[in-house]
Swiss-Prot record:
Taxonomic source organism: Plecturocebus moloch (Dusky titi monkey)
PTM field: Acetylation at Lys-162 decreases ATP production. Deacetylated by SIRT3.
Compartment list: Mitochondrion; Mitochondrion inner membrane
Keywords for this protein: Acetylation, ATP synthesis, Hydrogen ion transport, Ion transport, Membrane, Mitochondrion, Mitochondrion inner membrane, Transit peptide, Transport, Ubl conjugation
The protein's name in its UniProt record: ATP synthase peripheral stalk subunit OSCP, mitochondrial
Lineage of producing organism: Eukaryota, Metazoa, Chordata, Craniata, Vertebrata
Main location as per UniProt: mitochondrion
HAMAP family: ATP_synth_delta_bact
Biological function: Subunit OSCP, of the mitochondrial membrane ATP synthase complex (F(1)F(0) ATP synthase or Complex V) that produces ATP from ADP in the presence of a proton gradient across the membrane which is generated by electron transport complexes of the respiratory chain. ATP synthase complex consist of a soluble F(1) head domain - the catalytic core - and a membrane F(1) domain - the membrane proton channel. These two domains are linked by a central stalk rotating inside the F(1) region and a stationary peripheral stalk.
Motif (SIFI-degron): 5-23
Pfam families, A to Z: OSCP
Family per similarity comment: Belongs to the ATPase delta chain family.
Molecular function terms, GO-annotated: proton-transporting ATP synthase activity, rotational mechanism
């Protein structure tokens, strides 16, 4: 039963790799285009998973793949360019058997191994995650402050940020701390960037003072 899914994903990857339009390759376009090798693999996988209504399952499995490849022992045997291909294949087969990944995820791993692209796996996972984030209507937002925010302040900030979103969009907030900005905050939401840090204000003041003098 896995053969059609395997051959289908394989055809789609080759389709994007060669940019040749084929009548049988009716691809489901992802909500956002990710360029490069990783983008081509992720797009083909997104299309195949979407057709089978397994986007969430594949996303979960890919995150697990990324986690596994970060393990020192696995990385040493699978991502090391000096390790024989046969050894890598054996290691991957053992991992796939143990994790019981779906045919879609299994075939992606096998394709990456076959094409010598295992080093691009993390990039493919990242590209697929980006597609899924947009698919869910998530808007990435990063807030950087000099020190951790209090719960009340964070709650108020979330309310303000959500007011800028359109209906159906979901705020995906990440809060970071960076003492070097001295105070205030730096906000990046979607393609918008606002620097309200004390460091930048001081730099602007310093520049203005030098111009006056």
């Amino acid at each position: 039963m896995a053969a059609p899914a395997v051959s289908g994903l394989s055809r789609q990857v080759r389709y994007f790799s060669t940019s040749v339009v084929r009548p049988f390759a009716k691809l489901v376009r992802p909500p956002v285009q990710v360029y490069g090798i990783e983008g081509r693999y992720a797009t083909a996988l997104y299309s195949a998973a979407s057709k089978q209504k397994k986007l969430e399952q594949v996303e979960k499995e890919l995150l697990r793949v990324a986690q596994i490849l970060k393990e020192p022992k696995v990385a040493a045997s699978v991502l090391n360019p000096y390790v024989k291909h046969s050894v890598k294949v054996k290691s991957l087969s053992d991992i796939i058997a143990k994790e019981r990944f779906s045919p879609l995820t299994t075939n992606l791993i096998n394709l990456l191994a076959e094409n010598g692209r295992l080093s691009n796996t993390q990039g493919v996972v990242s590209a697929f995650s980006t597609m899924m984030s947009v698919h869910r209507g998530e808007i990435p937002c990063t807030v950087t402050t000099a020190s951790p925010l209090e719960e009340t302040t964070l709650s108020e900030l979330k309310t303000v940020l959500k007011s800028f979103l359109s209906q159906g969009q979901i705020l995906k907030l990440e809060v970071k701390t960076d003492p070097s900005i001295m105070g205030g905050m730096i906000v990046r939401i979607g393609e918008k960037y606002v620097d309200m840090s004390a460091k930048t204000k001081i730099q602007k003041l310093s520049k203005a003072m030098r111009e006056v003098i």
